[in-house]
């Protein structure tokens, strides 16, 4: 069965003049028992909607008075009636002059006047008193005598008359009259039916075969024996009688009514014009029982006849398919072909039509994936539910979620069951970044890249300043380098590119990156300090990268310098000096006096010649990111080292998950350049984001290709993060249980460059202990912004700024949010300060420190003050801010604080041993002579992080 929505039912009610809002209609349906209706979009079955429509219509609209038939076997004809005025009949009307009454008013209705029976045969007519309309049925029910019937032949009869002989028609009068209806056939006597009071204005019809006598025309003789009747008003032939529907009982033959029909031209011009039906048209109505909740009603069956379908004709099977159950029931009750009374007729719907499933072509049922694909993406491509795929994977023994990544083999098994084929589609980066064969004829000599490494404060930057004849070290915070610096220096031996790496232990990653991109490593060791931990780390990084090491023993100008001891220590790490028969060049130098610097440059040039450092400047540029940062007004800035080709302004490049077009380039002196050859460092502007230091960069044909490569790398990185969820093991659960009570310090790290941000984050994470952990919520490059403050406020974190400052008004916002901002310029200061913050999370240890004792000698009760214990200090000192224990018979009976301390009459802070004083104890008034007062103080001890 079809359904109907609630808002459609509201529109149907609105057409009947009942306006209800959606909420009111839903509440009304709930009151009628349709609790499944939730909103105006809910649906109801057709029979339910029809029943609800009928009920609401019955409640909101007044029911019209039902037209009930007076009895079977008669025709009801509705006319416009007028009520003639009451006229008193004269005693002896003259036969020659007929009387004419004045025309009655149209508003007055005709009321029959019941007449009383006269005892004499020919009495004089007496005027009957005027009675109301309600008295007419009572008078009609009285049994009239034969004399009364003769006197009043036109009186209305409530009971059907007995069949009688046909009465001859009256003589024709002068005025033309309408044709009279044919006489009805005799019928057997019917049982009497109770009469009902007729409505106001109702005029009863004459009995069959009898008509009331009409007044004779002027000059016609009156009929003998007929009673005098009130004269009827003249009828204007130009006035049409009102047309109305006539009800016809099907068991009786129809009585045609002749009416004036409009001319043919008018009917052709307006064939279906709205308004009353054409005059002369006969409508056939049938009285049928009403539907649920309704009374009997008249049904127009003439339309069925015109269509050639008779009432009671069985409904065909095709028609029955388009009808609801209630519609079929109503058609069966009325014994006729069903015609909808209200609403539009529904178009029959085709039942049994199967949904046609459009299958994809074979070439479209191939799924091309790379290394993996998520369950949700696979379900969307195949058009199946993700839950079905997850259920199948669970049957295969794989517990996955909708966003989990599955490999190509597993996806092929799932796709095969649904008629799909999986093909691995590898993203070939070589298509966008092709490898060019080395052309020996195009190779040119490039400058060597030299990385200066060593321990902190061993003079690396000072040595570079001496080579560059600059003073970079004086401008560094704390005199230490905290990010990689790239410089190109012109020497008598040719251009050399130097990379200055930090020596602090936190910058291990920077040193490793420096070792990867360099050709030579200059290991700086202080002659007075010797080999240190970061020196050893630098040696390991250089050996791992396979780079030649030159050792510069610095600070030989100091009195405590011992170059031989340094050379001896380096032999432990397989670095043997040439003077001792080894292969490692070791030179004593001094950055202050510039001793040994020319010899160092000569050895660097010699090593570069041995290595034969050459590159092709005509190919697309490629290299490595040395450092990256985010500057206000300039955006992401990357310091790159060009290893191959020539980098030009306008080139499209890609590095990691970022891409862009080179907008500008600047060298280490801040000068803008248009192109940079191999072996030179440069700052690049125009990337989409801050790249990761150490990533490679490549120049591609256009920015579109760069974007595709970057998006591919970002997708692989996201898949790796989603697929890198480690399953919980028993060891992990035990480790989590051990650290369940551990305090955690949340941090938001912002630094000036990407390398520093990485180094600071790693250093702070290493500061975590078993008692307090460190969690980095966010680590980024740039100034501290409002977003960082909101992130810290949400995570209850501390913001750590390294060589960066907050933007304007950010400190006020942080103060309002209760966020602490710590700014540092030196990394070890940041680590020490964060350790203090970590210790502040631990609960302090409360330790009791004894101060002294006093013996109660006498007790004083002072009004409005309380009890005062006159005591003598026997040990130590008694302080007013201390705590006190009252001991009696070696038992502590009270513990509290000292409320007052006086010496004689003066308030004092403390009383030393051997003096007497008055002590008041807060909250205790039962001090007795001989009690001992032990005075002590509580001090908080910060616990250790270890």
Curated annotation (Swiss-Prot):
GO terms for cellular component: cytosol. Residues 445-614 form the tr-type G domain. PROSITE patterns: G_TR_2, IF2. Residues 102-165, 174-185, 212-229 have a biased composition (Low complexity). Residues 554-557 are annotated as: G4. Residues 479-483 are annotated as: G2. Belongs to the TRAFAC class translation factor GTPase superfamily. Classic translation factor GTPase family. IF-2 subfamily. This is Translation initiation factor IF-2. It comes from Anaeromyxobacter sp. (strain K).
């Amino acid at each position: 069965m079809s359904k109907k929505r609630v808002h459609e039912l509201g529109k149907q009610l609105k057409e009947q003049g009942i306006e209800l809002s959606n909420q009111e209609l839903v509440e009304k349906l709930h009151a009628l028992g349709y609790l499944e209706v939730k909103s105006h979009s809910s649906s109801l079955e057709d029979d339910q909607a029809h029943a609800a429509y009928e009920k609401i219509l019955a409640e909101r609209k007044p029911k019209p008075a039902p037209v009930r038939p007076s009895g079977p076997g008669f025709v009801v004809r509705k006319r416009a009636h007028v009520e003639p005025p009451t006229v008193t009949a004269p005693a002896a009307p003259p036969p020659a002059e007929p009387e004419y009454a004045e025309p009655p008013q149209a508003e007055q209705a005709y009321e029959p006047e019941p007449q009383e029976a006269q005892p004499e045969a020919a009495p004089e007519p007496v005027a009957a008193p005027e009675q109301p309309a309600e008295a007419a049925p009572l008078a009609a029910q009285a049994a009239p005598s034969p004399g009364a019937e003769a006197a009043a032949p036109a009186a209305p009869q409530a009971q059907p008359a007995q069949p009688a002989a046909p009465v001859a028609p009256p003589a024709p009068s002068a005025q033309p009259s309408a044709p009279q209806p044919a006489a009805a056939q005799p019928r057997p006597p019917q049982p009497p039916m109770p009469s009902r009071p007729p409505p106001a204005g109702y005029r009863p019809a004459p009995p069959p075969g009898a008509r009331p006598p009409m007044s004779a025309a002027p000059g016609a003789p009156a009929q003998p024996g007929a009673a005098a009747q009130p004269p009827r008003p003249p009828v204007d032939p130009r006035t049409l009688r009102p047309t109305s529907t006539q009800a016809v009982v099907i068991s009786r033959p129809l009585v045609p009514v002749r009416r004036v029909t409009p001319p043919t031209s008018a009917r052709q011009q307006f064939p279906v014009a709205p308004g009353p039906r054409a005059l002369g048209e006969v409508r056939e109505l049938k009285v049928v029982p009403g539907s649920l909740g309704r009374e009997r009603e008249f049904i127009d069956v003439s339309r069925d006849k015109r269509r050639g379908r008779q009432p009671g004709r069985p409904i065909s099977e095709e028609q029955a398919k388009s009808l609801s159950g209630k519609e079929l029931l109503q058609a069966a009750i009325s014994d006729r072909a069903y015609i909808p009374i209200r609403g539009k007729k529904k178009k029959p719907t085709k039942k049994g039509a199967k949904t046609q499933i459009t299958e994809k072509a074979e070439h479209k049922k191939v799924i091309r994936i790379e290394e993996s694909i998520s369950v949700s993406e696979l379900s969307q491509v195949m058009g199946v539910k993700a839950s079905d795929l997850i259920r199948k994977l669970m049957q295969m023994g794989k517990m996955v979620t909708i966003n989990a990544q599955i490999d190509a083999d597993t996806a092929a098994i799932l796709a095969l069951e649904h008629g799909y084929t999986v093909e691995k589609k590898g993203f070939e980066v070589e298509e966008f970044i092709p490898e060019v064969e080395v052309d020996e004829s195009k190779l040119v000599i490039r400058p060597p890249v030299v990385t200066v490494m060593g321990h902190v404060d061993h003079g690396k930057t000072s040595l570079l300043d001496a080579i560059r004849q600059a003073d970079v070290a004086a401008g560094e915070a704390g005199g230490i380098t905290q990010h990689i610096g790239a410089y190109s220096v012109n020497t008598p031996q040719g251009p050399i590119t130097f990379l200055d790496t930090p020596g602090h232990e936190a910058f291990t990653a920077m040193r490793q990156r420096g070792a990867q991109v360099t050709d030579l490593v200059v290991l700086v060791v202080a002659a007075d300090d010797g080999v240190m931990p970061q020196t050893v780390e630098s040696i390991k990084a250089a050996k791992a990268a396979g780079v030649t090491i030159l050792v510069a023993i610095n600070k030989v100008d100091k009195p405590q310098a011992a170059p031989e001891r340094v050379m001896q220590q380096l032999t432990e790490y397989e670095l043997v000096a040439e003077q001792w028969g080894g292969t490692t060049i070791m030179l004593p130098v001094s950055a202050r006096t510039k001793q040994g610097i020319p010899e160092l440059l000569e050895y660097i040039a010699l090593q570069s010649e041995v290595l034969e450092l050459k590159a092709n400047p005509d190919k697309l540029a490629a290299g490595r990111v040395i450092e990256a940062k985010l500057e206000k007004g300039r955006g992401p800035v990357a310091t790159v080292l060009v290893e191959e080709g020539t980098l030009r302004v306008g080139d499209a490049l890609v590095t990691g998950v970022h891409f862009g077009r080179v907008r500008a380039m600047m060298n280490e002196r801040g000068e803008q350049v248009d192109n940079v050859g191999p072996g030179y460092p440069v700052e690049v502007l125009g990337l989409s984001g801050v790249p990761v230091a150490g990533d490679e960069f490549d120049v591609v044909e256009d920015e579109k290709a760069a974007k595709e490569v970057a998006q591919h790398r970002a997708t692989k990185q996201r898949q790796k993060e989603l697929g890198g969820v480690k399953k919980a093991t028993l060891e992990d659960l035990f480790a989590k249980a051990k650290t369940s009570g551990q305090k955690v310090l949340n941090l938001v790290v912002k630094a000036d460059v990407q390398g520093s941000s990485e180094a600071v984050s790693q250093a702070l994470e290493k500061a975590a202990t078993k008692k307090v952990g460190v969690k980095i919520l966010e680590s980024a490059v740039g100034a501290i912004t409002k977003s960082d403050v909101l992130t810290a406020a949400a995570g209850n974190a501390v913001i750590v700024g390294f060589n960066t400052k907050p933007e304007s008004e950010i400190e006020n916002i942080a103060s309002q949010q209760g966020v602490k901002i710590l700014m540092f310029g030196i990394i070890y200061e940041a680590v020490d300060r964060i350790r203090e913050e970590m210790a502040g999370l631990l609960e302090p240890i409360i330790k009791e420190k004894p101060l002294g004792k006093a013996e109660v000698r006498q007790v004083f009760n002072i009004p409005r003050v309380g009890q005062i214990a006159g005591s003598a200090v026997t040990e130590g000192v008694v302080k007013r801010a201390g705590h006190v224990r009252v001991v009696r018979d070696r038992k502590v009976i009270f513990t509290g604080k000292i409320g007052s301390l006086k010496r004689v009459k003066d308030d004092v802070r403390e009383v030393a041993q051997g003096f007497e004083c008055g002590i008041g104890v807060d909250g205790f008034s039962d001090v007795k002579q001989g009690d001992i007062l032990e005075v002590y103080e509580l001090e908080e001890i910060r616990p250790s992080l270890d």
